[in-house]
Amino acid sequence: AQARLLALAFPLPATTLPVAASVGHYLVEDVVAKRTQPAADLSAMDGYAIQFADMPGPWRVIGESAAGRQFDGQLSTSRAVRIFTGAHVPAGADSILIQEEAGRHSDTLTLTGAGPPGAGAHIRRKGTDFSEGDRLLEAGMRLTAGPIGAAIMAGFGELRVGGRPKVSIIGSGDELLSPGEPCDAAHIPSSNNIMLAAMLDGLPCDTVDQGIVADNLDDLENAFSSCA
């Protein structure tokens, strides 16, 4: 009987939803990155962008780079740029001197600690997370918080997901009574309808409680017909 029922199942038409509305749905196509993340070399620490070859300094601070507000100039020898976590690393810089190991007086920067261990220190390289064209999510995946975040970072504002099936729940039996009704020894409370609806809660489907149907073929046929 189960095999016959499953053989009648078919995929519902796909739909396009905003990413915020697609939570809990299932992807119908792969998510392929439209952008690279990070899109540029970024600082992993607060501090100063420098050229490692200039160690141990001193340097002259010539500007500032913050997230969303980058330094557009070129860093040259013995120069430094104040930088914050997530900011673009200026052209010409190859290391970050963290602020805990630096001293600054006006525009003069000096080394007060060990300094970066080598060129490339404290820099998140372009494409560390993923590159444009990478397949990040596979069709058939259920969209939870993590995949939703990945899709957004990959450049998606909408996603193609499966349609929402309608699930009708029927409680059948002459012995069933609605929850809370007084029960004698010949009857029991009908718990399955509400229990099954609770189990389906959170899945991408619409549930309809069709109530209790007596053990009568005509009534059952009518109930099933009303679900179509």
PLM region spans:
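Short, low-complexity N-terminal leaders and the immediately following helix N-cap/first helix
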Residues: 1-56, 107, 125
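Short, intrinsically disordered, charge-balanced linker/junction segments flanking boundaries
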Residues: 227-228
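Short beta->alpha junction loops
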Residues: 209-217
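Short acidic active-site motifs
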Residues: 219-223
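Short, glycine/charged-enriched hinge/interface segments at domain edges or termini
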Residues: 49-209
